[in-house]
């Protein structure tokens, strides 16, 4: 149990302040175009402020046609950069490592959500 509070250093040079990591949870709080919402920003920042050594976003789709669920965070457009940059800065300001889980739903992308036949 004592190791949980010890730092963890990765070969790449990053170091977690402790060994607590926020798993990528699907919270469906982003806007329909994948832009980070204030609610999702606040939720993730609160996790970092709470002491996680690593804070990971929900699954963020890398292509519009790869969206898997409504309210999914996007990382495929310049329109997403402002919110993602703000989020990374906020997470880091609490001493937590910011990680974005990337995702493509492929054939499981709902046609009614992406507007066309999914890739598969």
For each feature predicted by the language model, list its residue ranges:
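Flavin-dependent oxidoreductase catalytic cores
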Residues: 1-120
């Amino acid at each position: 149990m004592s190791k949980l509070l010890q730092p963890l250093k990765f070969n790449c040079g990053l170091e977690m302040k402790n060994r607590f990591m926020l798993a990528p949870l699907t919270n469906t709080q982003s806007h329909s175009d994948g832009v980070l919402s204030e609610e999702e920003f606040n939720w993730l920042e609160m996790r970092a402020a709470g002491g996680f050594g690593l804070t990971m976003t929900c699954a963020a789709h890398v292509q519009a046609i790869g969206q898997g669920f409504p309210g999914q965070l996007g990382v495929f457009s310049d329109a997403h950069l402002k919110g993602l940059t703000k989020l990374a800065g906020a997470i880091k300001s609490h001493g937590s490592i910011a990680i974005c889980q990337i995702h493509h739903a492929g054939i499981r992308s709902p046609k009614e959500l992406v507007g066309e036949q999914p890739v598969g």
